[in-house]
């Protein structure tokens, strides 16, 4: 409906009253920007499409098109602010080259691996796709099919994909691109606390006395949260900010303690801080004795490379990289005592005075500390260790699970938490922190999903890098990519990724809204609906689940990923994909389609299409005859309710600006594990890390170990990759926004001016960035936002014309299997 002036006055009055009472504010009760003209625009709430901050926006539609967006003034996360990408959200869906019909490689009228792309109908696309999947399943079985998903999937899209892969095709070869960004954080949360995701929330920004950024350029990558941090720093004189990075960036402008360290040496710095806390007598012994256990981690664990690589062959602890051996405080203290101030300074290249200043922020018992990190920590061959080490500091001092004391892992995708982690679309996970290797967890999933006992596979599937290797080696032959641009985002793409996509044994499907590098390497491209062209839900970094309605129609024949997954499932019967022993034991399932078993199962289809808000369209409900988003969400929510992952009823989320789980009796949780905030902590317990059977968190002792590859005489520079403010990930959306394209049209190589001069190069010189794996051409930048130390260069990865991941190394953390995009050796040569 369109807002009239009377509607607007009533809505704003309601908003004022609700805000005064501390109540959630409805989506209608919003100030409307733009004057009288805006009153002819229909406004609805949604979370932003970009990063994991989870900003709320108001989306304005008119005549079936998104015509404007503005920051949602009632959203707690951003309070009406947008970053530059959020400001241009209304343009991301309207690039001239939107995909509007399926495209199949064809020659002489039939599918051919070496054919040219030609438009086909959805029926023809699914016919060929199903035939290829059935061929592979029949010839090689479930381990030869795979899927690569996304932290940009909506919650129900990821959930439907997990059901189709695990229960339908009986394959755990399902992984999200969040493997490249959040796996180390998730793994360390589980190992330390027994549950995933931060215990704190964004309210910590208004309560902390110190902020320490570890490998996080928040000023560009999380600018809205940076604005909250900046406000706290500038309005309270006692607040301090420390920023640690391998080069100087915009977040350094606010730093009281700016620290530039050698790549990979943050591990030594972290152990030094732990030693400083212990040696100066600032351990909170009461907290440590009551709430923690100590362990030692396996060492010399390798670098996640192919088994035949010399570094893997030499690694003595690679066979059990995640092993943890119980120990005591004294043994832990002895380990970190080796990391004296002098040794940490020598390893890291940081001035001792700065390290001591940093350590005091954590050691001071009267100072509340919020640690913040993202890719610099997680994209690290010892990323799990780095995450553990920062938890060590908070646990040793008791600075955790209360306002202002918060180790906080930031996320880069809008639902890396809500979908990849909470739904469990990793190769080893099920919903609500359950895992495929646990027979009780599998049985629980089979019960909720109404499946025959013993159906779900017990083996851990291939992770992201391993999927590329298995495609390369012909071990995965049917592969579906949704909502990611893996051919641009994966490491070492020339040697590992591209050969797998073009392997003649393999059939590659890509679902996307725009042509991408990945799509150009596929055999079948399916046009996808974007953002508010479908009803959706995301979960952000502070455990906030946020819904939106479908507001416009997708162009042409583009369809949501949810529709694609559900519709494709109709092409298979249980007799074609399940083993005979399962069907013999459960004959009632014979002859049923996977759609009937997984989606028309009396649970997902129990809500009629008439439940859809009559003011909004729902393409999937109209086609399937029931409300699949509601059914999938309520079925999924059953995994977590009563188990510390409680979600509110489906309809509640359409009325509020998101709620932070666990949501118990209508109340969200801001700080987990702490009495008075968390309903799962009983009166008198004070604090309990209830993810662990004994309620205790783990303090892990591990050493500094060097990166997989370092500069040498031939390859004399460290290469760091990452993002810039104006573009998001591979640029497939932001490069199609004219204003963002003009602001930063192409990638450059940031270099120290003295390094350039010593090679006879200048700002703007065309150069080759060369590694042992590949090379690109780009131009030098010796000024501007990123100021490099000698011997380090930075190249962003958003530019498809400069595929910097031809150069990167496919080393990954042996525990989390997250890729290290921050450290490899390159040489720079003039063209």
From Swiss-Prot:
Substrate binds at residue 797. GO terms for molecular function: 4 iron, 4 sulfur cluster binding; electron transfer activity; iron ion binding; molybdenum ion binding; molybdopterin cofactor binding; nitrate reductase (cytochrome) activity. GO terms for biological process: cellular respiration; Mo-molybdopterin cofactor biosynthetic process; nitrate assimilation. This is Periplasmic nitrate reductase. Residues 1-29 form the signal peptide. Mo-bis(molybdopterin guanine dinucleotide) binds at residues 85, 152, 177, 181, 214-221, 245-249, 264-266, 375, 379, 485, 511-512, 534, 561, 721-730, 805, 822. It comes from Cereibacter sphaeroides (strain ATCC 17023 / DSM 158 / JCM 6121 / CCUG 31486 / LMG 2827 / NBRC 12203 / NCIMB 8253 / ATH 2.4.1.) (Rhodobacter sphaeroides). The keyword Acyltransferase does not apply. Its EC number is 1.9.6.1. Induction: Nitrate reductase activity can be induced by nitrate and not repressed by ammonium or oxygen. The gene is napA. [4Fe-4S] cluster binds at residues 48, 51, 55, 83. InterPro entries: Asp_de-COase-like_dom_sf (IPR009010), CT_Nitrate-R-NapA-like (IPR041957), MoPterin_dinucl-bd_dom (IPR006657), Mopterin_OxRdtase (IPR006656), Mopterin_OxRdtase_4Fe-4S_dom (IPR006963), MopterinOxRdtase_cofactor_BS (IPR027467), Periplasm_NO3_reductase_lsu (IPR010051), Prok_molybdopt-oxidoreductase (IPR050123). Its cofactor is [4Fe-4S] cluster; Mo-bis(molybdopterin guanine dinucleotide). It is an enzyme of class 1 (oxidoreductase). Disulfide bonds: none annotated. Residues 41-97 form the 4Fe-4S Mo/W bis-MGD-type domain. PANTHER family: PERIPLASMIC NITRATE REDUCTASE (PTHR43105:SF11), RESPIRATORY NITRATE REDUCTASE (PTHR43105). The keyword Zinc does not apply. It catalyses: 2 Fe(II)-[cytochrome] + nitrate + 2 H(+) = 2 Fe(III)-[cytochrome] + nitrite + H2O. GO terms for cellular component: membrane; nitrate reductase complex; periplasmic space.
